[in-house]
A protein has these predicted regions:
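Active-site oxyanion-binding pockets that recognize sulfate/phosphate
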Residues: 46, 50, 54, 143-154
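Post-signal-peptide N-terminal segment of Sec-exported extracytoplasmic proteins
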Residues: 41-76
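Hydrophobic and amphipathic membrane-targeting/association helices
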Residues: 2-3, 24-29, 79
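Bacterial Sec signal peptide processing site at the extreme N-terminus
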Residues: 17-43
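Sec-dependent bacterial lipoprotein signal peptides
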Residues: 1-23
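C-terminal/domain-edge helix-coil "capping" segments
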Residues: 147-176
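Surface-exposed short loop/turn segments
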Residues: 66, 71-151
Length: 176
């Protein structure tokens, strides 16, 4: 049998859980009760992503377009997303005999800006930063090292695209 003290603690914990549960809502759920309002998923699919200038930017662009539309046809764009990236290599471990790095980290930093198409005030709807890091081992075989670096670049680009998608979705969910 439960004591009165344990019963009151259990009741308090249950009450807190119920209150906290009422505060949470799904990010991509339909939260627009008024007809004509768009939910987050519809607003994300109406984002046009700028053209890419290199392979890494194209990887990020492809990941963003798929995350926004889910592979479906995009509707008429309401927003334009601009992403600028900077990348660098960081040598983590250096072989003491050859003075060559044996492990490197590919660092990708991105700044992004979401603008409303047709807006004349010049203020962004949302802007932010994202970053991705991916390590890889350097081999004595040149082509293995090139492929490992390319895979690290792709992994870092995926992380950046996921961070951008999550930040924009959270902003659009809280700022209709």
């Amino acid at each position: 049998m439960l004591s009165r003290d344990r019963l009151s603690r259990l009741g308090l914990a249950l009450g807190i859980a119920l209150l906290a549960g009422a505060c949470l809502r799904p990010l991509y759920g339909d939260t627009s009760p008024a007809p004509g309002n768009q939910n987050v998923r519809d607003r994300l699919s109406a984002i046009e992503v700028q053209e890419a200038t290199n392979r890494i930017d194209q990887q990020i662009r492809n990941d963003l377009i798929f995350a926004f539309t889910g592979g479906a046809a995009a509707p008429e764009p309401l927003y334009r997303l601009r992403v600028e990236t900077n990348d660098a290599l960081q040598s983590a471990v250096v072989d003491p005999f050859t003075s060559r790095p044996t492990t490197e980290t590919y660092a990708l930093d991105a700044t992004f800006r979401l603008d409303r198409i047709g807006s004349t005030d010049g203020k962004p709807v949302f802007q932010g930063r994202a970053f991705g890091r991916a390590s890889y081992d350097r081999s004595r075989q040149r082509f293995a090292t090139i492929r490992a670096r390319r895979d690290a670049e792709d992994r870092a680009a995926d992380v950046v695209a996921q961070q951008i998608t999550t930040q924009i979705a959270a902003h659009l969910a809280t700022n209709p």
